[in-house]
């Protein structure tokens, strides 16, 4: 009875839902998967999107975009390190001087006819005149130092007593090296005191010329002279020919090496033995031959040694040197000729000009300023 009632209720419910079809219990539902897009248009009420339009929060986060426009101006400071290595001044080499192909002006003892022989004062005056080389004589002292001095003793220029080789540098430099010099008569010994203008300057009795000191009138060391004139070449005569020659040669070579002066010096001696001994220890230094070698070359027809220049007087022992045979030998040997006047009366512009006319390559002048004027006037130098 209860079952019948249930069936009746189900039938009535199906009819009420509008289904007139038979209630096929097969319930063939569509495949659950392919459900149509549940477009659940849940039309919600306008969600008043509170766009809280806040006032421009002038949070000027001052991102001060410090436009550090890091314009990385890569200023590639190409530090062109111009290392101006200020090199010390250098004198011309002897080869460079000879290559000039023009007469050279050599100041004999600094220009002994114009200034006190072999003093720093004379050498400075010669440099001011524009000479090419400074000519000087050297001797060894008792304490092994090379000094610039002509004679074996000191009387000739200082009026003092003593032998250079037996005196120390200190003893020599205490002397007045301008004692006997006179512009009117060099080397006269019998003039009035007033005719010796620089007498007493070394000892402080007389004021030195402006720009100079008492030391400029003393016997000077070779090294000091060479250091004082770094841009001038030197013509150095070794005066020692005795037992002191070896010491003089050693001292000269040592000074040349210390000063890096080997290529800007010509070394000469009257003694061929001294020149040969020097060449043994310094074969790369320019030299001029000694007397014996010169005679054997000119008169004996022997070959001249390795010398770029010969130095001669116009006359030697009463014999005229500057003759045709001499110049023929010079041309064949391919050497330069430097002449040193052998008397005071030859120390003048006229005689200098005569020598130049002969084709002389250089003059060891006692008046270098006068010779420089001859060179300028004759158009020999630029």
Please report, for each region that a protein language model flagged, where it lies by residue.
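Extracellular mucin-like PTS domains
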Residues: 24-87
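Sec-dependent signal peptide recognition
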Residues: 2-9
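Phosphate-group recognition and catalysis centered on beta-loop-alpha active-site segments
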Residues: 18-23, 85-382
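C-terminal motif of bacterial Sec signal peptides marking the signal peptidase cleavage site
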Residues: 13-16
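A periodicity- and composition-biased signal for non-globular, repetitive helical segments
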Residues: 8, 61-62, 114
